[in-house]
Structures are given as C-alpha cells and as structure tokens.
C-alpha cells in the first residue's frame, strides 16, 4: 500500500462520482509533472450525498503557474471539473483543445449582459453533479476585496463551497474543507480572504 505521506496525488482524493475516467496515461502525466517539480496534493474532497454541485474556490491566485500546477493536479486526481476562461484562449488551436478537454467553457465578456456568474449558473444548472473551480479574486493582480460571484453561483445551484489553496512555500496544493457559510456575504468573503493568507502564492505581493 502506498504511504499517504509520500503520495504525490491520487484519484482516491476525490469521490468516484467526480472522476473523469481519463486514460491512465493522462493521470500519469499529471503525477509525473508534480513529482518533477517537487509538488504534491494534500487532503481530499469528502464524499457527498447524491450528485451535488461543488464550487471549489482556489487561491491565492497570483501567477499563471497556479494554472500549470492546477491542471497537473486535475490530471493526477482524474477530476471531472468545469471552469471558465476568456473566449480568445479557446480560439487557439492547441491551447483551446486542451482547455476544452480539461472541462473549460469559453466566456465572451465583451458581449452585453454576459458575465461569468450568469454563464456558470446556466451551465451548472444543467449538470447532475459538477466540480466548478473558480478563483474568488478574479485576477492575478492585487485586489483588496474578493468577488462574490461564487456565493451567488452556490446559492443559485444549491451547492457546496469547498476551500482549496496553492502554497508555493511548501510546494503543495491543499484540498481543505467545505466552507460553512454564514449567509452574510461580507463576513464570508472576509473569512475566505483571511483564510488564503495562511498560504504563500508564487507572487505574494499580488495578494
């Protein structure tokens, strides 16, 4: 049996209903990449009753490297996720195919009346159980206040919010726990903002 203390990443860290069932090779690529850079995934997403929608908020988001290690972890976990990105990225031949393969959905924010929150709610309401990964900061640049979109999405789809973090000081991605929402958006956002201060981003000055 593999010693969990030495484990890099495993599909056992997420419930079976949220697994993508990708080829073993894809999972091995993710694990190899994390191992090559000395990274690992700690913690797990607990099993839930039924196919519930889970909004995973990940931070602190300070660099494009978050996405690099995040995708490697998703492959290693064999996680079936949904995320949203700029439509222009999906127009690039190789990158666009990769993002779509990983569960990405393009969003054209230049169109009137179209926002990430509305697109997320529309897409998640059609899914029978999904892991939506989102950055509550909404940008890699420094911001004083987190965006409340994930709270609005969660309320609309009657899901659960799960905390995850990037820690570049200890080279790990942390799958922590479900967030016990108070119902007061300002208090919940302040709690999440403070929570992420426990971890060191690639560019700490951006958080």
Q: Predicted regions: what is each one?
A:
Residues 2-41:
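Extreme N-terminal tail/first-helix region
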Residues 19, 39-198, 203-207:
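Soluble catalytic domains of membrane acyltransferases
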